[in-house]
Amino acid sequence: MGTFVDFVGVAKQAVRHHGGISMVFRRLWQVMAFEGFSGLKKKISQVMAHRRSLLSSHQSEGITQLGRVNDSGKNPMAPKAPLASGALLLGHPFGVLGMGEHVRLSASAFSAAEVPFGIRNIYGEYGLHLAEIHQDFPFKDKIAKDGCYRANVFHINADEMVNAQIHLGKDIFTDRYNIGYWAWELSQFPHAWRSALQLVDEVWAPSRFIEQSIADATSLPVIRMPLAVEFPEPNGMTRESFGLPDDRFLFLFFFDFTSYVQRKNPEGAIRAFLQAFPDVDDACAGIVIKMNGMDLRPKEYQAFIQSIDCEDPRIILLDKVLTDRETKSLVKLCDCFLSLHRSEGFGRGLAEAMYLGKPVIATGYSGNLDFTNEHNSCLVDYRLIPVRDHEYPFAKGQKWADPDIEHAVWFMKRVVNDTHYAQTIGQHAADFIKTYHSPSAVGAKYRGRLAALNLV
């Protein structure tokens, strides 16, 4: 009970002083997942100390005479260092989350386009202990505390922008062209996040879906900038490494209990599988459900377990925390990626499966439509339904997809029974992703936009 009380205490303190409740709790979950309660309390203390330091320095600025050297020894009126051509990529380079992958792959794209860049870990050394998970990331030497480039590209979501300014200080925003490279999973951009628009000069949207959502909320330029998808071919692991059977076609489905389960719709995926293959003794196919966040959301986990048939040996639940290499190996070892999502901002999981040449069965709605089509994917029909209040933040007035289970069942049967079709779809998928979402292709778009703004 003591640890729970401690957690509630630091959480309340964070919300009271740190701003942005949805962002705060997501950050708390991330810290606690890897560092436990003691790490969580330590992180809160560091943040609070940093905030007090910033507030103190701001107060001091109000009484410092012009030209007078302040306590740091720097003259506030001294000429500033010239800004270099290129961009500073700000985000969570060690984060084991989608936005962490976002900044890492952007670095690859900037490098491929030969655009000068640096990387800034917004929260200092947060996540540094996770560096070994990202052994394939070749730009760790680019991560520094300083970086004076003409452009800043923020690889975080809009709800983190104000908090990022508190951590980084206002100077890093000054005299730079600030770009928010944001994600969002619903069709209407939250009104509560519009203050973030005051901190940027333009927004880059990873998909047309996000582009439209944000463009409806601002007069700032909103530019569609696709995400890069590339990684070393995973090898050295087998199905046995994950305890998976070798004698059947395996569907793969991902979701995280800390990231709003209803959006990913695991119940729909399992229901479709059981309708497609109703005979429990039919060993031609199985479905692997890769889960994260069970320890942080035990009630949701138990409710999910009770909602499915755990006695069916064809439904395989994986709850082990995997490295990036292991995750991609798992995708490679399965036969089809299933995503009966209700909405996706982009859909990196789908894109990575396609990169590996896997047939993808996915809801034909939202961000994934930028790279999934009838020639390279199995797009499932849907109808729009209201998002209920408890299902996602800022749900009021929003709608998302309810995928057609019968249509998904038809595709699932086809990829199992028609090997040629599955292989053809998978090959078209790999060709598309490697052509249009390679670091060089995406980097060319980055360079083109920054050049148009005279920033490179």
Model feature map: region roles:
Residues 3-151:
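N-terminal pre-catalytic "stem/leader" segment of glycosyltransferase-like enzymes
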Residues 67-78, 88-90, 126-213, 326:
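Extended catalytic core of nucleotide-activated donor transferases of GT-like folds
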Residues 101-104, 108-109, 117, 231-324, ...:
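Conserved catalytic-core segment of nucleotide-activated headgroup transferases in glycan assembly
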Residues 342:
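Aromatic "clamp/platform" in nucleotide-sugar-dependent glycosyltransferases that forms part
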Residues 359-362, 378-379:
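Short hydrophobic beta-strand element within catalytic cores of glycosyltransferases
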Residues 407-410, 414, 421-435:
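A short, well-ordered alpha-helix in the C-terminal region of glycosyltransferases
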Residues 439-456:
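C-terminal alpha-helical cap of glycosyltransferases
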